[in-house]
Amino acid sequence: MNRLADKIKNKQFVITGELNPPKGIDLESLFKKAEGLKGCVDAINLTDSAGSNMSMAPIAVAKLMEDKGTESILQVTCRDRNRIAIQSELLGASALGISNILCMSGDPPSGGDHPDSKPVFDIDAVQLLNVIDSLNAGSDMSGNKLNESTDLFAGAVVNPGSEDLDKELARMEQKIEAGASFFQSQGIFDVKLFEKFMESANRFNVPVLAGIIVVKSANMARYLNSNLPGVTVPDEIINDLESSKDRVESSVKIAGRIIRDVSSLCSGVHIMAIGWESRIPRIVSEAGLTE
């Protein structure tokens, strides 16, 4: 059973979370966080060395997490592997029972903790989606037949706050034509901007999960404004966080409010709590989404 695919295909509201595999082999903390999200989210993204900072391979974490009853979304980037290695990993994921794949181009290594690492980028996210479409149809990227086809459910990312919205929408359409069945967006703070984006994106009739970044402090908000393209945390939120006597409570209420405001515009939300995963159940409750 693929809960994520079933809910998306049945047009039900979807909630996903995100966890970063560790730098090391101790998974106790990650499993504890995943356990705390059961019944609250439909699936959990496992990042692929996020920000080009080396961490455990997410495919290993996904398998172990699925064995414990938590559905995963395996992030696959094009940064570190050529087309042979990527196809090999996708076959491995399918053999392990990992179905959900989020296709991403990936961040350049220069910004991570191994800045001298050589980037690969043999293919990009659109081509990666095409690869999955081929594997699901029973052949590899070169047209060679597989002894059994995969059954992968592919998604992609989109940035509603892109400076060039027409270009972003064109890229989104390319991803859909290549096989994207759903999208997770970059973090949303400006609801009117997201509404404008969705007015254009709705013509594609492909589900979009609005990205919700849990902002922990005014300083974090300023950092996002300076370093994350397409993300603008408004002064109102920064001022609220700066003057708050209970930073955690304010952060939870802000995230909950944004979810309430965007929930009628999209097919679900993707909550990026960045270390505050234990607060996601409260955020979901604050948003009025608790069953």
For each of these PLM feature ranges, what is it?
Residues 14-29, 72-84, 152-167, 241-253:
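Active-site mouth loops of central-metabolism enzymes
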Residues 18, 44, 93, 175, ...:
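Conserved, mostly hydrophobic/aromatic
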Residues 24-37, 57-58, 84-90, 163-175, ...:
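Short, acidic/polar
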Residues 119-139, 146-147, 157-161, 205-254, ...:
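Active-site pocket-lining/capping segments in soluble small-molecule metabolic enzymes
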